[in-house]
């Protein structure tokens, strides 16, 4: 590792990818929660499959719009807190709250649940983009050499793998306790 970035810097940067754990919870557990398998007798489907797909499509359209907007704003920011940090700070808390909101839907009707999931999903992906896009753009900002970029990327990948494992196991344990 280079002398400019310390081992501690690499580890702290790698830990920053913890936001990815939230995305894995979304990817692996949200469909299960809203549309559990028929073998799960104590879990009731919250949405018809076609409504779940519509909510996911709406959320991803919002994601496709927010990605380049946040990227442009982050690249051109002149914030005194750093051009990337302000976005990550702005998105972090909403991302956590919106993740929790996914699992507390309005259950009055299929349409209400569809609208709720669509709105929460669109906001979730906007908050996710506020955290993830600037974080991933930090590598060229932090590293001055090819070796540093490679080391930062390796740390990010290592922690991403660890956080994926946590996201695969922990929610299953929590769901089984419900």
Question: Residue spans of the language-model regions?
Answer:
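Membrane-embedded alpha-helical bundles of multi-pass transporters/translocases
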Residues: 1-178
């Amino acid at each position: 590792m280079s002398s400019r970035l310390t081992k501690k810097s690499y580890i702290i940067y790698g830990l920053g990818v913890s936001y990815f754990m939230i995305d894995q919870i979304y990817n692996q557990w949200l469909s299960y929660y809203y549309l559990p398998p028929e073998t799960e007798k104590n879990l009731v489907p919250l949405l018809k499959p076609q409504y779940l797909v519509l909510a996911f499509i709406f959320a991803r359209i919002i994601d496709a719009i927010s990605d380049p907007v946040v990227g442009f704003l982050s690249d051109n920011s002149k914030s005194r807190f750093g051009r990337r940090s302000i976005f990550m700070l702005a998105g972090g808390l909403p991302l956590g709250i919106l993740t929790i909101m996914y699992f507390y839907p309005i259950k009055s009707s299929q349409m209400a649940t569809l609208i709720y999931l669509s709105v929460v999903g669109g906001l979730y992906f906007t908050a996710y983009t506020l955290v993830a896009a600037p974080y991933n753009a930090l590598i060229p900002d932090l590293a001055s050499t090819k070796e540093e970029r490679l080391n930062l990327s390796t740390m990010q990948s290592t922690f991403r793998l660890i956080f994926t494992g946590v996201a695969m196991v922990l929610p299953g344990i929590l769901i089984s306790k419900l």
